[in-house]
């Protein structure tokens, strides 16, 4: 209205009609504005009621959400505590498992070392077993040789016994011959003094007496000895068919000495064989005891191969008979404490 220019009126009627028309126009616009205002107020009231309802719903929803949020916070706190507890337990379990793993690895290493030691001990035992088998085979071979030698020596011992009987018989006969020879010599001296012209007759009588004494032995001889050794009548030197000469007596004494030396050599061989058999038996028991102890031992002890020393007859093994010791002049020859040719045998 202020901005509008008021036109110039020529008359009062025009001015009145103008202002009347303008008032009606403003009245109509006022009426429209009031209707719009009423309509706007009604719409705003409806909108306010709707917004209030929505606000109530939003507040209720907000309260519910806050309650849910608080509940979720509590749950989150509980889950955090539970997670921390689970993490602590898991850490403890992991640390325990790591310790167990380290201990298991250490035990595994120890078991590997123990297995290697057992393998080495097994190899040592196998080598010792092979060496023991070889030594046992050698021992069995030597034992068989010793048994054969022992059987041979037993046969020689039986022969020695028969020789001892014959030697004793020959000694008795030689003693009787010496006594009778002394008697004959005394008788010859007496006869020479009494009758020096008949020496041949006395010699013939003496030879006949010597032959008679030789035909009758002083000691009885067994049946087996009579079958083995010839009697004085069957000696081809002429003891039973011709007079006993001094050379024949000397040869008989030499035979007796040779027999005594053979008897001494046989006794020394027999003593060596008995010592060897005893030592080999003790050695065999010692070896079997060592083998059993080495197999049953669980701490890896090794088999000792230099713990026992025995003796064997070098002459028996090599087939060489050493020279016998000089015999005693009597019948019984002393048995040596250690036979010749004995050497230490290490196993």
UniProtKB/Swiss-Prot annotation:
Region: Self-association, residue numbers: 56-166
Keywords: Centromere, Chromosome, Coiled coil, Cytoplasm, Cytoskeleton, Developmental protein, Differentiation, Kinetochore, Lipoprotein, Microtubule, Neurogenesis, Palmitate, Phosphoprotein, Transport
Membrane-spanning residues: none
Subcellular location per the Swiss-Prot or TrEMBL entry: Cytoplasm, Cytoskeleton; Cytoplasm, Cytoskeleton, Microtubule organizing center, Centrosome; Chromosome, Centromere, Kinetochore; Cytoplasm, Cytoskeleton, Spindle
Source species, domain of life: Eukaryota
Coiled-coil ranges (or none): 28-190
Region (Required for localization to the centrosome and interaction with dynein, dynactin, tubulin gamma, PCM1 and PCNT): 256-291
Chain segments carrying region Interaction with YWHAE: 189-256
Modification Phosphoserine, positions: 215, 231, 242, 346
One Gene Ontology term from the biological process aspect of the record: regulation of neuron projection development
Pfam families xref list: NUDE_C
Interaction with KATNA1: annotated segments: 195-256
PANTHER family: NUCLEAR DISTRIBUTION PROTEIN NUDE HOMOLOG 1, NUCLEAR DISTRIBUTION PROTEIN NUDE-LIKE 1
Physiological role: Required for organization of the cellular microtubule array and microtubule anchoring at the centrosome. May regulate microtubule organization at least in part by targeting the microtubule severing protein KATNA1 to the centrosome. Also positively regulates the activity of the minus-end directed microtubule motor protein dynein. May enhance dynein-mediated microtubule sliding by targeting dynein to the microtubule plus ends.
Protein name: Nuclear distribution protein nudE-like 1
Organism, scientific name: Macaca fascicularis
Classification of source organism: Eukaryota, Metazoa, Chordata, Craniata, Vertebrata
